[in-house]
């Protein structure tokens, strides 16, 4: 659907989705619904296990609770609307589109800085184990968890305000399955250069600052691990970091591939695959990454289940 609105912004957008084939749409609906249900179960389960087991009331699992909350929210911002579009109407209102873009950017930025906070926690645990409880005080933990949300809100607010000043009256067709910056910028009838530069600075600074702090933390962690004499000690220290490193690698590689490039290099097929990965797949992977290799979480699940059985 195309239409001119006499210099008036469109009232709604049309999300073209991933495919026009009804058979493939139904298959994607079933797949995405299954992934979303597993995402809900995994992240809510992780939050509940950490809350219910006192032995997991530590800074590491405090941050992991918020990571699960962000992943759950992150997926909820995109997946339900995507599922609805696959079955029924693919319309989204102008306000709804920008609201989706705001929360998506807010949660994405918050997760970047939360991963930095988690890296600092691992640095304190491995490099200063005797002073860990003093370093990771309640006040510092609250600061490290509040900061990502505040920065995420500010960055997302600036992003959405700058995007809302653009005009969209030539076309309302978004060649994507959700409201993201690149395909929406492509619809604008006005010059987007300043907006693109601003978004590039926001996204670039977020990725650079968070990646720098994560990298710096792991450089110190690596030097500390190399100084450990026993092989078992090295393996134990490394095992506490491998889950976080894997999560960071997957999350940042897709973000950098998608956002740190000029709009002219936007590729519909490639970018949609990357978007599916970090909006739908990554939120379901994190609970698996942080629990399957974690004996403390497994033991906590057993303890919670045993307490439930004993209480009957």
Swiss-Prot record:
Specify the taxonomic lineage: Eukaryota, Metazoa, Chordata, Craniata, Vertebrata
Main subcellular localisation = membrane
Q: Would you name any one GO CC term?
A: plasma membrane
What is the name listed in the Swiss-Prot or TrEMBL entry for this protein?
A: Olfactory receptor 8H2
Top-level division of the source organism's lineage? Eukaryota
Query: Which ranges of this chain reside in the Extracellular compartment per its record?
Result: 1-26, 77-99, 161-197, 259-271
This protein's species is: Homo sapiens
The subcellular localization recorded is: Cell membrane
- List where the protein spans the membrane: 27-47, 56-76, 100-120, 140-160, 198-217, 238-258, 272-292
Indicate which residues are glycosylated according to the record: 6
Which InterPro entries does this UniProt record tie to the protein?
GPCR_Rhodpsn (IPR000276), GPCR_Rhodpsn_7TM (IPR017452), Olfact_rcpt (IPR000725)
Describe its membrane topology. Answer: Multi-pass membrane protein
Cytoplasmic side: which ranges?
48-55, 121-139, 218-237, 293-312
Q: What are the protein's GO molecular function terms? A: G protein-coupled receptor activity; odorant binding; olfactory receptor activity
């Amino acid at each position: 659907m195309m239409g001119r609105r006499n210099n008036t912004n469109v009232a709604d957008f049309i999300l073209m989705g991933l495919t026009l084939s009804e058979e493939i749409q139904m298959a994607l609906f079933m797949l995405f619904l299954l992934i979303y249900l597993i995402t809900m179960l995994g992240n809510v389960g992780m939050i509940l296990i950490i809350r219910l087991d006192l032995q997991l009331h530590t800074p590491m699992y405090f941050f992991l609770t918020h990571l699960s909350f962000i992943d759950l929210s992150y997926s909820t911002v995109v997946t339900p609307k995507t599922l609805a579009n696959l079955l029924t109407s693919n319309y989204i209102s102008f306000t709804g589109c920008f609201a989706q873009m705001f929360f998506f950017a807010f949660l994405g930025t918050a997760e970047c800085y939360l991963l930095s906070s988690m890296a600092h926690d691992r640095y304190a645990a491995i490099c200063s184990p005797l002073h860990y409880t003093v370093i990771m005080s309640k006040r510092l933990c609250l600061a490290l968890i509040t900061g990502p949300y505040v920065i995420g809100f500010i960055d997302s607010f600036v992003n959405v305000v700058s995007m809302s000043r653009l005009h969209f009256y030539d076309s309302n067709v978004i060649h994507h399955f959700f409201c993201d910056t690149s395909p929406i910028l492509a619809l604008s009838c006005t010059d987007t250069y300043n907006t693109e530069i601003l978004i590039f600075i926001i996204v670039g600074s977020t990725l650079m600052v968070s990646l720098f702090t994560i990298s710096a933390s792991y450089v110190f962690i690596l030097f500390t691990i190399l100084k450990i004499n026993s092989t078992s000690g090295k393996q134990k220290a490394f095992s506490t970091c491998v889950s976080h490193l894997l999560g960071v690698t997957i999350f940042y590689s897709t973000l950098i591939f998608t956002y740190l490039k000029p709009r002219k290099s936007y590729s519909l097929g490639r970018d949609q695959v990357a978007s599916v990965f970090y909006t739908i797949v990554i939120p379901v992977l994190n609970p698996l990454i942080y629990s399957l290799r974690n004996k403390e979480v497994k033991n906590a699940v057993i303890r919670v289940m045993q307490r439930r059985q004993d209480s009957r």
